[in-house]
A protein has these predicted regions:
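Hydrophobic alpha-helical transmembrane segments of multipass integral membrane proteins
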Residues: 41-44, 74-80, 84, 113-121
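Alpha-helical transmembrane segments and their membrane-interface junctions
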Residues: 43-51, 116-136
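Short alpha-helical packing/oligomerization segments
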Residues: 59-88
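Transmembrane alpha-helical segments of multi-pass membrane proteins
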Residues: 66-74, 100-117
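Cytoplasmic membrane-interface regions of multi-pass membrane proteins
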Residues: 84-99
Length: 136
């Protein structure tokens, strides 16, 4: 099994108490933050590069730090919702609750990384539009 497979398809928590579910989720938080943070660094780098290409546009400046901090907190609040969702399912359906942790983790990670990379095509589209308006 590859490292990526182990990350994306972890074994579920079979004990299923709120405490063990919390431990299961917290054991993966650093991995989640590394993936989302890496995507964020890549997005910022591409946006800085694209904004520096002619025809000119305002650069990123230092105003983006606040947005990065807010986004990081929001991403971790969203991550916490995975644990709360799984505990809620356990409370509602008791023993019949599905082992949803791995699927929730995968879906949440995919959504967060995708949302974090969304500025890349937007920045490229913005540059193409600047180029078109500059040429015509």
């Amino acid at each position: 099994m590859t490292a990526l497979t182990r990350i994306l398809f972890p074994l579920p928590d079979y004990r299923r108490t709120p405490w063990t579910l919390l431990q299961w989720w917290e054991a993966r938080r650093l991995t989640y933050n590394l993936f989302v943070g890496g995507a964020g660094v890549m997005s910022l780098a591409v946006m800085a590069l694209v904004s520096s290409l002619p025809p000119g546009a305002p650069g990123l400046g230092f105003k983006w730090w606040g947005g990065v901090l807010i986004y990081g907190v929001a991403a971790n609040v969203g991550y916490t919702m995975g644990w709360l969702t799984e505990v809620g399912m356990r409370v509602l359906w008791e023993e019949e609750a599905p082992l949803a942790g791995p699927a929730l983790f995968r879906q949440g990670l995919s959504f967060a990384v995708g949302l974090t990379l969304l500025p890349v095509p937007l920045a490229i589209f913005s540059w193409v539009m600047r180029l078109v308006t500059h040429l015509f």
